[in-house]
Every structure is written in structure tokens, then in C-alpha cells.
Amino acid sequence: EIVPAYKSRDVGFDRSMIGAYGHDDRVDAYPALMAEIATRNPAFTTVCVLTDKEEIGSDGVTGMQSMYVFHFMQELCRTAGQDDIIAFRNSVCLSADVTAAYDPSWASAFEPMNGTYAGRGIALFKYTGSRGKSAANDASAELVGYVTRMMDADDVAWQIGELGRLDLGGGGTIAKYVANRGIPVIDIGVPVLSMHSPFEVIHKTDLYMAYRAFVLFNQAAE
């Protein structure tokens, strides 16, 4: 595999952004891992999954279409003497994946009123997919309310939107594979400019809000 070798760098007159290769999806994976490490004595068991092959369909033994994560969770439940089916049903998952930030240079690919913007906080998506909701996970209104209440209570900046213009934009995440196991899941992540290019750009505020949201999610419970 050949990837750009340059280091990440500050971008902008105010140095408010970070430019680098591979923000998709390291910019979500890293704060998720750091949030898991920072979590102490959570009310419920927390699991942080850094899974592979998302860009090619989550196939293979290390992708989310595999059972490796769910077998691990089943083993946790059985060790604790609990029913794994009930545990899955009572779980909640954040599918941490980036989204395309509104780019005025390519405005035709976006719906400005329903897009997400760099610098306005972590982005939340009720549903993903393309061509409407094809190949999508569609989070319930109750789950959207739970997550937004949680962030509002701790002043975490967030925004909600869609993955680009209808029938033009769109994208897939691992959320549907988690939902297929009966676990309520919603997509959340950092908006990215120039996604899938050798030099992707994100806003530092959004990255910090992602970390805060993940820590809060691990510690909060209703």
C-alpha cells in the first residue's frame, strides 16, 4: 500500500483546521479510543471497536460483516451470566464515521440547508445510504433524542444533516451491520473537506467535540 508520507499540518489564517492524509477515518477512531481510555467506572460496560475494511464493504474476517465483534460481546455476556440477546437489545451504539462538510467549490453536490459544515460541531445523521435510504441504517427518533439530549446537557456543539444532495451524494457506514444484530445505532462523526483526497481537512473544534461526545456517551446513561 502506498500512502502520502507527509505529516499533518495546521491550515487556515487562524490555524483552526488540520490538513492530513487519512482523516477518514482516523479523525473519529482516535478520539473514540482516547474516550474509551479516559472512561472510568461507567454505569454500563463500554466497548470501543476499531474495525477494518469499511471502505470496501466491511467484508472479511476483520470487517463488521464478520461476527468477531458480536462473538466477543456474547462471550462477555456469558461470562457475566447474562443473556446476549437481551444485552444486544438494551445496548446503544455510536457509529463513528466522517461525513463530507459543505464545500462551496462543489456546491452542486450538497444541499446547503441539510448539509453539515466544518467548525459547527460534531455531525449527527439519522440515516445514511444513497438514492434515498438505500443500504441505510435509519435511527429511531427516540435514539436521536437520547443522543442530542445527552450532548445538549453538557454543551457539546452538534449539527444534524444528510450525506450530500439526494440522488447525488450519499455513502455507507458500518451502522447497518450493527443494526442487523438488533443493536440501536446512529451515525456520528467529524465533517471533512476534500474527503478521499491525499489532503483532507477538518476543523479542530469538530474534533474536540467528537472527543467530548464520545466520553459523554460512555459515562452517561438513561
Predicted regions, residues:
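Active-site-adjacent substrate-binding region
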Residues: 101-106, 110-197
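Short acidic, glycine/serine/threonine-rich loops at helix termini
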Residues: 13-14, 58-63, 104-107, 199-200
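A glycine-rich helix N-cap at a beta->alpha junction
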Residues: 66-94
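His/Asp/Glu-rich mid-to-C-terminal helical/loop segments that flank catalytic regions of hydrolases
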Residues: 36-50, 190-222
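Soluble metallo-hydrolase cores and metallopeptidase-like ectodomains found primarily
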Residues: 1-20
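Flexible, glycine/charged-enriched surface loops at secondary-structure junctions
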Residues: 42-48, 81-90, 151-165, 222
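Acidic, glycine-rich active-site loops and adjacent beta-strand->loop/helix elements
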Residues: 6-8, 50-57, 98-100, 164-167, ...
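Alpha-helical metal-binding/catalytic segments enriched in His/Glu/Asp
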Residues: 19-65, 71, 213-215
